[in-house]
């Protein structure tokens, strides 16, 4: 998936799931399943419920996404 095709939205983490997946609520109220991007996994960036994150969504499947950034609180 080329980066230019991805839709980036802000979200809030609702719960942590197994295998580095998270249920997040988008700013428009929808809930999607998101996993951590590779660079966040390599650098051990911790994500906890309640954190604000940036999520990339594919235009082909809007129910799944990738967490690419955690905002500093």
UniProtKB/Swiss-Prot annotation:
Subcellular location(s) per record: Cytoplasm
Alphabetical list of PROSITE patterns matching this protein: S1_IF1_TYPE (PS50832)
Family matches, as SUPFAM superfamilies: Nucleic acid-binding proteins
Occurrences of domain S1-like (ranges): 1-72
Highest taxon of the lineage: Bacteria
Single Gene Ontology MF annotation: translation initiation factor activity
Keyword terms: Cytoplasm, Initiation factor, Protein biosynthesis, RNA-binding, rRNA-binding
Gene Ontology CC entries for this record: cytosol
Quaternary structure, from the entry: Component of the 30S ribosomal translation pre-initiation complex which assembles on the 30S ribosome in the order IF-2 and IF-3, IF-1 and N-formylmethionyl-tRNA(fMet); mRNA recruitment can occur at any time during PIC assembly.
Function: One of the essential components for the initiation of protein synthesis. Stabilizes the binding of IF-2 and IF-3 on the 30S subunit to which N-formylmethionyl-tRNA(fMet) subsequently binds. Helps modulate mRNA selection, yielding the 30S pre-initiation complex (PIC). Upon addition of the 50S ribosomal subunit IF-1, IF-2 and IF-3 are released leaving the mature 70S translation initiation complex.
Family label: Belongs to the IF-1 family.
Record's protein name: Translation initiation factor IF-1
Gene: infA
């Amino acid at each position: 998936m080329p980066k230019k095709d991805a839709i980036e939205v802000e979200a809030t983490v609702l719960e942590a799931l197994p295998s580095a997946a998270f249920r997040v609520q988008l700013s428009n109220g929808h809930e999607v399943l998101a996993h951590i991007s590779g660079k966040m996994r390599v650098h051990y960036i911790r994500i906890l419920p309640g954190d604000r994150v940036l999520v990339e969504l594919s235009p082909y499947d809007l129910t799944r996404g990738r967490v690419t950034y955690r905002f500093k609180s």
